[in-house]
Amino acid sequence: MNPQWKNFLLSEQAVIENDGRIVFAESQSDQPHIYPISDLAVLSVSGKDAAKLLQGQSTCNVFEVTETQARIGAFCNPKGRAIATFLLAKQADAYLLVLPQELLEPVKTRLQKYVLRSDVRFADRSNELCLLGLGWSETAVESLFAAHCVDGMVLISLGSTPYRTLVIAEPEQAENLWTDRLGQGYAPGNSEDWRLLDLLGGIPWLDQATSEEHVPQMLNLDKLGGISFTKGCYTGQEVVARTHYLGKAKRALFLAECALGTAPAANAAIRDRNGGEQSRGQVLTAISRDGICHLLAVLLVSESGEYDLVLKDHPDVSLRLLPLPIA
């Protein structure tokens, strides 16, 4: 985190936990909120061959990314398993990859292997740029991943209800935006609350435990516009395309909740209530709040459309499936 931004948040009465989470005093839930984002980072990719390199490694069509249109996507290994998911935006001559902090260095190292003689430069800008989230109650008025460049900041619409925008800004811009929004009646929100909103919005962020576990369709990236089936070759493309052209994926991403005060770990097994020990899927990410656990899970798709599922380690706790904002 940028030191200037960190000191500003501390001056705004933030508490920064040892695990990086940023916490403020409680505020009314019906207020619009502004959130510091602590679990994501920014990798800049620039140079005249940047688009070509990214196009050959990502599931989305990089040539569709402009200063007014961002994209979600994934980098895959040769077996078609997603190494990391990302949001990709464009600012001037550089592409900005927003992805989990813990996967930035592995992604950067892997992409650098493909540079060879190309004019491509990578820069971890996590200590230069700040990530913020804006959330308010109105229904989305912009298309998902619509982008804007305003006063040097990049804004990406995340749709859903509440309507949300992710902001990439330099420290002074972030401070000014924070002060301005608080003056408009916004309340400071906890970084973990933003993570929960991402989860409820069906944004399939990966971590070290879930990296290289799932093909992109299992993460609903096709439904989020994060897979192009016409762009041509990229690493893992054959497996991703085969999954698409053979028909419906056998597994998909589901949103669920259960009465559990402690969130299960990533990859925790999920099974049928009366189906023995055979796994029906696993947890992708989970957050517990006030005795309710919200989770994204990759599950076998039921032909009947009926599910009676429990966590393997909590067989008495039923999972209730909820509709994803985009499914």
Where are these regions (language model features)?
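Acidic, low-complexity central loop/insert segments
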Residues: H33-P36, A41-V42, L87-G201
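Short amphipathic beta-strand starts and helix->beta connectors
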Residues: F24-D30, R71-T85, V115-L116, A146-L155, ...
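A common structural junction motif
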Residues: N61-V62, Q112-V120, R181-S191, N274-Q278, ...
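Short, conserved active-site entrance elements at the starts or edges of catalytic domains
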Residues: S191, L197-D222
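Glycine-rich, small/acidic residue-mixed loop/short-helix segments
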Residues: N2-L9, L219-I227, A241-A327
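Acidic, proline/glycine-enriched N-terminal capping motif
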Residues: M1-I72, C76-N77, R81-I83
